[in-house]
């Protein structure tokens, strides 16, 4: 396991997470994605590209009463090992992270097709004008030989028919994401994330239901900050209290 790491807290110290001092570290994106999952009453969850485990740890905390079985797939073995350590330190015995390269496919990663009720993912992306100087962080955010289409197709293969896929990504990726899901998943629910009023959305949260033909829905926008720069009341309920988006509507 990595010897140089920090212990940090999420959800107002409900979750203790261990992260590398240098390299990929969890952001608010992870907490927002975990809060977007709705309607779960039990079953199996797959976290693709699990990083430091922040998304699934936050989700496990919120869904504790349903005892979700969560599997995390992570390309960097040291992050998978550190995530398992975090899970045990938080008392979660039904979360397991494994080293996996999803570019190889489901079979090669011991992922049975159509076997998960929910798939969650923060797919890699590249901020073309802001390359990361850190190799670990760059790996987490950008697979140069593995595009968003292949990533989401892996999600579609892993989830059960009519199971749900939850992702967070750059706002400008919305047209591509909708194109990839077209004919394969429907009932899209799209939530735009804004830093403040009168600013463009930087992130989008999307829920897609495999094989569904239901129409797309645009949800009310979400603002993370107030005009004075502090977290909005709604954001505090998610980032600190650990509530889901459904709980604050």
Residue spans of the language-model regions?
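SAM/dcSAM-binding transferase cores
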Residues: 200-249
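Conserved beta-strand segments of alpha/beta enzyme cores
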Residues: 16, 69, 94-96, 186-189
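Conserved Class I SAM-dependent methyltransferase catalytic core
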Residues: 146-201
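Class I SAM-dependent transferase core
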Residues: 2-40
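Short loop/edge segments at beta-strand edges and connector loops
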Residues: 19, 99-100, 169, 192
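Residue-level signal for inorganic ion chemistry
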Residues: 33, 122, 151, 208
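Mobile active-site "lid"/loop adjacent to the S-adenosyl-L-methionine
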Residues: 123-150
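Conserved SAM/SAH cofactor-binding pocket of Class I
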Residues: 36-132
